[in-house]
UniProtKB/Swiss-Prot annotation:
Belongs to the UPRTase family. Pathway: Pyrimidine metabolism; UMP biosynthesis via salvage pathway; UMP from uracil: step 1/1. Transmembrane segments: none annotated. This is Uracil phosphoribosyltransferase. The gene is upp. Allosterically activated by GTP. GO terms for biological process: UMP salvage; uracil salvage. Uracil binds at residues 194, 199-201.
Length: 209
């Protein structure tokens, strides 16, 4: 079973508390999502492999560590996942970016996929699927399904806020996918929203209703 890790770094928790406030402006919300994503990126990339390389400093030759050249891909679930991409790219600017577009049917609460655009070599990449919310788990499961159908096998799911129901469903559907979140909240309400949550992340990111 994949792990669910709550990243409790003080800066992440401080910024998340501001993000949750209903009076946080669209501008500040967007900036905070980007900042939290960048901070989380340090944690979720902690196990990237290193190799020894010889370099020349201004003083002498030395053996140092650098990434092995492992290929990375960041795959946001549209719309809201877009807000987390730049934070990750600030750490790994050479990563490729794919897109999986979904919307949630407001009656059934089930996700509907309308776009899949991925790097051709997605099966060779370590993938970070990013979405601010892990609520019912439906979108996350469908996104991982789409990636696996295209040969991907090394996948992590990264969100800002998760509900226990969504974590359980994603772990049951894809036990090989590790989940990273800044907060594990109380529950889902009858409308499928996370409680206490932060509202509709997409609407708050883009100033829509």
């Amino acid at each position: 079973m994949g792990k669910c890790q709550v990243i409790s770094h003080p800066l992440i928790q401080h910024k998340l508390s501001i993000l949750r406030r209903e009076d946080t402006s669209t501008k500040n919300f967007r900036e905070l999502v980007n900042e939290i994503a960048m901070l989380m990126g340090y944690e979720v990339s902690r196990d990237l492999p290193l190799e020894d390389v010889e370099i020349q400093t201004p003083v002498a030759k030395t053996i140092q560590k650098q990434l092995t050249g492992k290929k990375l891909a960041i795959v946001p679930i549209l719309r809201a996942g877009i807000g987390m991409v730049d934070g990750f790219l600030s750490l790994v600017p050479a990563a490729k970016v794919g897109h999986i577009g979904m919307y949630r049917d407001e009656e059934t609460l089930e996700p509907v996929e309308y776009l899949v655009k991925l790097p051709e070599d997605i099966d060779q990449r370590q993938i970070f699927v990013v979405d601010p919310m892990l609520a019912t788990g439906g979108s996350a499961i469908l996104a991982v399904d789409s990636l696996k159908k295209r040969g991907a096998g090394n996948i992590k799911f990264v969100c800002l806020v998760a509900a226990p129901e969504g974590v359980k469903k994603l772990q049951e559907a894809h036990p090989d996918v590790d989940i990273y979140t800044a907060a594990l909240d109380e529950k889902l309400n009858e409308h499928g929203y996370i409680v206490p949550g932060l509202g509709d992340a997409g609407d708050r990111l883009f100033g829509t209703k």
